Design a protein with these regions (language model features):
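An extended, acidic
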Residues: 1-105, 121
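Non-transmembrane, aqueous-exposed alpha-helical and coiled segments at domain scale
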Residues: 106-108, 116-118
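Short, surface-exposed linear segments at secondary-structure transitions and domain or protein termini
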Residues: 121-127
C-alpha cells in the first residue's frame, strides 16, 4: 500500500505473492488512494482449478486490475498487530491498550488514521 506514496517512501513499485483474499484487500486499499495493482490466480492444482470454477471463475489465466478485484464503494480498515511500515503494533501499558488503525474509502478518497486507547480490558479476553 505504501508504494502509492513514493514521496514519503522512495518506493515506486512493489512485487509480491499471496492468496486471493490478501490480493482483494490490497486492491481495495489501493483503489482508495489512487494506486495501481494487477493480479492473477495461480491455479496449479486440480483442487484449486475446481474451487475457482465453483466460484464462477471463467478465465483462469486472466490478469485482473484493482477495479476488477475490488468493485463498488470500497471501505478498508486495518489495525496494526505488530509494528510495521504502515501501522504501529498493539501497545500494552498498565492502564491502557493502544491501537493504531487506518481506514480507507474509495468513494471519497478519504484516509482516516485512528489512534485508540482501550481502557476496558475485559473485551479483549486476555486471560
Amino acid at each position: 500500500i505504501f508504494t502509492t506514496m513514493p514521496e514519503e517512501t522512495g518506493i515506486d513499485i512493489d512485487l509480491g505473492i499471496g492468496a486471493a483474499p490478501e490480493g482483494v484487500l490490497a486492491a481495495g486499499a489501493l483503489r482508495c488512494i489512487g494506486g495501481q495493482m494487477q493480479g492473477r490466480l495461480i491455479l496449479d492444482t486440480e483442487e484449486k482449478r475446481s474451487r475457482a470454477a465453483g466460484m464462477g471463475v471463467k478465465a483462469p489465466n486472466k490478469t485482473y486490475d484493482r477495479t476488477e478485484m475490488a468493485r463498488g464503494d470500497v471501505i478498508v480498515a486495518a489495525t496494526g498487530v505488530t509494528d510495521g511500515a504502515l501501522l504501529k503494533g498493539v501497545r500494552f501499558t498498565k492502564d491502557v491498550i493502544e491501537t493504531e488503525t487506518v481506514v480507507y474509502r474509495s468513494a471519497t478518497g478519504t484516509v482516516r488514521r485512528i489512534q485508540a486507547e482501550h481502557r476496558e480490558f475485559a473485551k479483549f479476553h486476555l486471560d
